[in-house]
Amino acid sequence: MKAFYGILIILLFCSMFKLNESTTINVKCTSPKQCLKPCKDLYGPHAGAKCMNGKCKCYNNG
């Protein structure tokens, strides 16, 4: 049973690192719409974008 919990914790940590694939780029923004094109240029058509603290944050969803 201890081995099961150990494997479960390892899988949890691995999934957290996979979900956190984001990059902050040096593009100023006030809305996510301003970030979408630069992020798509960087990661391709499946990229996601957010505007956080006046900078664009890109997510690789592909």
Curated annotation (Swiss-Prot):
The record marks Y59 as: Aromatic residue of the functional dyad. Disulfide bonds join C29-C51, C35-C56, C39-C58. It is found in: Secreted. InterPro entries: Scorpion_toxin-like_sf, Scorpion_toxinS_K_inh. This is Toxin Ct28. Has the structural arrangement of an alpha-helix connected to a beta-sheet by disulfide bonds (CSalpha/beta). It comes from Centruroides tecomanus (Scorpion). The record marks K50 as: Basic residue of the functional dyad. It comes from the Eukaryota. One of its GO terms (molecular function) is potassium channel regulator activity. Belongs to the short scorpion toxin superfamily. Potassium channel inhibitor family. Alpha-KTx 02 subfamily. Keywords: Amidation, Disulfide bond, Ion channel impairing toxin, Neurotoxin, Potassium channel impairing toxin, Secreted, Signal, Toxin, Voltage-gated potassium channel impairing toxin. Expressed by the venom gland. Blocks voltage-gated potassium channels. Residues 1-22 form the signal peptide. The modification Asparagine amide is found at N61. One of its GO terms (cellular component) is extracellular region. The keyword rRNA-binding does not apply.
